[in-house]
């Protein structure tokens, strides 16, 4: 069975929530049934299927966010939240 495409918001909507330095705050749910990025009440909620083991969930979050932004995963950097659900990610300049 093919993996369903994740539900992703437009890149402009995600970039609009970043601060002046291009940092985006995320709330992550690892081990979810489906992968998605939602914007709710001015917050970015990310759900990934990967379990939080050996950084697998963090890698999945960056890959999903990169897909939503149309950027390479290597251009995104996790600044804070390596072991928590609240994360701060540095986005590349638009």
Model-derived segments and spans:
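Contiguous, often N-terminal, cationic amphipathic patches that form binding interfaces
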Residues: 1-73, 77-94
């Amino acid at each position: 069975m093919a993996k369903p495409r994740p539900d992703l918001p437009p890149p402009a909507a995600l970039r609009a929530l970043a601060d002046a330095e291009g940092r985006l705050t995320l709330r992550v749910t690892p081990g979810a049934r489906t992968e998605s990025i939602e914007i709710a009440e001015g917050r970015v909620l990310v759900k990934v299927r990967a379990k939080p083991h050996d950084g697998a969930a963090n890698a999945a979050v960056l890959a999903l966010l990169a897909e939503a932004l149309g950027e390479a995963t290597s251009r995104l950097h996790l600044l804070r939240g390596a072991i928590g659900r609240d994360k701060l990610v540095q986005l590349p300049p638009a």
